């Protein structure tokens, strides 16, 4: 059953899990896309203005490198957000798999903070988010496994 929910034989637009996990997934889509655009569009990519990485103390080349990496990170987040959005509008049976991916991402973000810490002037919002989103992802993954009424679009063939 675990595998059947994560990797259904037929991918459809039917969602049979708890509605809370679905609506929370919608909120995560919005957060992911907005966050990605911030990293891509802010002049510093959010590296100093949000994450408080002291790039103003770096050489011009190092500062440009950090900003470029933040842009690429934003681009990867945008791609993830678009995949989440496609799942939400067309392939809802994959929502449990998306919650698994979401949870794994935040587990590795947390581990990276211990393994390869980044110098910041303050606690970055993402660092706090790791401690919130890991339990949230686990709870939503669990709820997405709970059978409830079928939710689908009229186009779900």
Language model regions located:
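Membrane-water interface at the C-terminal end of transmembrane alpha helices
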Residues: 135-154
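Hydrophobic alpha-helical membrane segments
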Residues: 97-114
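Hydrophobic transmembrane helix segments
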Residues: 31-59
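Cytosolic juxtamembrane helix and N-cap/initiation of the first transmembrane helix
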Residues: 2-35
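Juxtamembrane helix-break-helix junctions at the cytosolic face
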Residues: 81-96
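Non-cytosolic membrane-interface motifs at loop->transmembrane helix junctions
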Residues: 51-53, 119-132
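Core segments of alpha-helical transmembrane spans in multipass integral membrane proteins
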Residues: 50-85
């Amino acid at each position: 059953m675990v595998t059947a929910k994560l990797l259904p034989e037929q991918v459809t637009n039917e969602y049979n899990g708890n509605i809370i996990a679905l609506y929370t997934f919608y909120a995560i889509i919005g957060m992911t896309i907005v966050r990605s655009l911030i990293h891509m569009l802010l002049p510093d990519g959010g590296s100093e203005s949000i994450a408080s990485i002291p790039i103003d103390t770096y050489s011009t080349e190092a500062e440009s490198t950090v900003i470029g990496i933040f842009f690429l990170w934003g681009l990867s987040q945008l791609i993830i957000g678009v995949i989440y959005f496609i799942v939400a509008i067309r392939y809802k049976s994959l929502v449990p798999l998306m919650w698994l991916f979401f949870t794994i991402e935040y587990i590795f973000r947390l581990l990276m903070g211990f393994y390869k810490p980044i110098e910041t002037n303050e606690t970055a919002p993402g660092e706090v988010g790791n401690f919130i989103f890991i339990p949230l992802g686990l709870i939503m993954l669990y709820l997405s496994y709970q059978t409830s009424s079928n939710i689908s679009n009229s186009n779900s063939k």
